[in-house]
A protein has these predicted regions:
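Periplasmic OmpA-like peptidoglycan-binding domain that tethers envelope proteins to the cell wall
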Residues: 75-191
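Conserved phosphate/oxyanion-binding catalytic-loop motifs
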Residues: 72
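Periplasmic peptidoglycan-binding/tethering modules of Gram-negative envelope proteins
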Residues: 1-69, 108, 168-191
Length: 191
């Protein structure tokens, strides 16, 4: 399945018929989705103001998909103690969840998880295209990163420091306590 997505197209007054080809990005619900541009204070869980647009986009997506629940995960690079990184990433995931709750998202739709350094990023096609020294399906483990040039190491570590979400359920609030569909489809009116 895919997440709901909405786009608008505005055209100036057109005097004749015209065909528009539109491509809509479809985010799969089976793979984690990276949330770009979420920034934290150094070595803290405090969200920086420049994260607002990305967080507000996440709120919009959750409002457009009212029946999903998500795991919100934060990740660190390998530097620092493993236990410390796990705690820091948990606090960061919780700070994102707190922001979402403060902006009207139901708490029971959100599960914060801090993975620390235990789930290094796997490189996908778009990232590999941006960084020619990475190949699709490379995994940014400590061992892999230490073989890179210093400037590449910093980029790889930055890619590991990320916030993602994945869909856990697609049936949130769809059924009553007896298992009946809350809003069944309306039957067509016969003439």
């Amino acid at each position: 399945g895919f997440l709901n997505h909405k786009e608008e197209i505005h055209v100036d007054s057109v005097k004749e018929s015209k065909v528009y080809d539109l491509q809509f990005p479809l985010a799969s619900i089976s793979a984690p989705v990276l949330i770009d541009n979420i920034f934290y204070a150094f070595d803290k869980a405090t969200l920086l103001p420049e994260s607002k647009n990305a967080l507000d986009s996440l709120i919009l997506m959750l409002n457009e998909n009212p029946n999903i629940t998500i795991e919100l995960s934060a990740h660190t690079d390998y530097r620092g103690a493993e236990a410390y990184n796990k705690t820091l990433s948990q606090k960061r995931a919780e700070s994102v969840v707190k922001y979402l709750i403060n902006h009207g998202i139901a708490p029971d739709r959100l599960t914060p998880v801090g993975y620390g350094e235990e789930k290094p990023k796997t490189i996908r096609r778009k990232v590999a295209e941006r960084y020619p020294w990475l190949k699709e399906n490379d995994v940014l483990t400590e061992e892999f990163i230490l073989k890179l040039k210093p400037e590449q190491q910093e980029t790889a570590n930055a890619l590991n420091r990320r916030t993602e979400f994945k869909v856990l359920r697609t049936t949130y609030n769809m059924f009553d306590k007896d298992g009946n569909l809350k809003n069944p489809p309306k039957k067509p009116v016969e003439n």
